[in-house]
Amino acid sequence: MKSKLIYGSKAQKVFEIAKERKFALPAINVSGTNSINAVLETASDLNSPVIIQFSHGGAQFIAGKSIDNTSHYASISGAISGAHHIHNVSDNYKAEVIIHTDHCSRKNLPWIDGLLEYGNNFYKRKGYPLFSSHMIDLSDEPIEDNINTCKEYLKKLTDLEMTLEIELGITGGEEDGVDNTGIDSKKLYTQPEEVSYAYSELISISENFIIAAAFGNVHGVYRPGNVSLTPKILKNSQEYVSKKFQIPDNSINFVFHGGSGSSLDDIREAIDYGVIKMNIDTDLQYAFTEGVRDYIIDKKEYLLSQIGNPEGKDIPNKKYYDPRIWLREGENTFKNRLKKAFEDLNNINTLD
């Protein structure tokens, strides 16, 4: 699996190539093997690198909703299980993949601690990490507290050849049980000074970090005009940091959160300013559901009973209600929407 996993210096190299060639990697939240396999299949078909990520809630779902998650055990074991699945099946696909965990607030840090404990043992046995990266999201705290904690985790991740994602400014909307719909709009826009502070503190430890800087991003999907994205904030931050630290233009690796429903112009402009990763969840949830919905509507008369359909009262319907059939329909519509995301991100045949 090691050759298929993008991690450490290889991840940094991929990010640099992405900025040079003006493309970004889609980061897909998954909640089971159906979505994992659909991501791997799409990335393989398109010959393009991809990021598969687990949220705290998505990981819990993989382990099983009946498992007590008070101590984060379900989220820990679910994320580990999902990551192992990627390692185990990826040789069947051409895709190269970054395995990541999504937003982790302070109250959920024991989740990451549990993954790191397991990950340390995995790294000692294998010589490479189980996960490529983790995200720590303390954007609702004072920046000093945010970065001080992130520095401690960056040290731990660096020892495992992993990357840290941090967040500056808050992504609006609601996702995975976190509701920021009523947040002060000023917090939706990161300032260059904040990016500069984070960069100066983290670069002293390692270059293996990426920054989710807020530029009006909102989780979920909204009608056009209801969300005001300002990608120029990223440009201003790049220029500020470049001048202050005398480093090349676009040195910061930025992350675009809340990618669902975003316009192509905003996406491409953000890529111009150093975005190398864009999170997509809501659109793909709906896309998967579309396939299942349409199949059930189309085959309704074959799904009303186990035996008996328009072709005859004694004809069995097993081939219609077998979950593998309608789950595959969901995978196919999921893949179609994901392909569009790859196209929007200018990430087609980028492994050549």
Residue ranges of predicted features:
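Catalytic-face loop-and-helix region of soluble metabolic enzyme cores
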Residues: 91, 223, 233, 242-321
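Glycine-rich nucleotide/cofactor/substrate-binding loop typically near the N-terminus or early
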Residues: 67-70, 99-101, 290
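N-terminal amphipathic alpha-helix/helix-capping segment at the start of soluble metabolic enzymes
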Residues: 1-26
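Hydrophobic alpha-helical scaffolding
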Residues: 29, 72, 185-188, 227, ...
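Short, conserved beta-strand segments within well-ordered enzyme catalytic domains
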Residues: 27-29, 51-53, 98-100
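Glycine-rich beta-to-alpha transition loops that act as phosphate-gripper elements at the mouths
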Residues: 30, 99, 103-105, 252-262
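Alpha/beta enzyme core
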Residues: 9-17, 33-94, 105-250, 264-269, ...
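Extended, intrinsically disordered, low-complexity segments
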Residues: 298-352
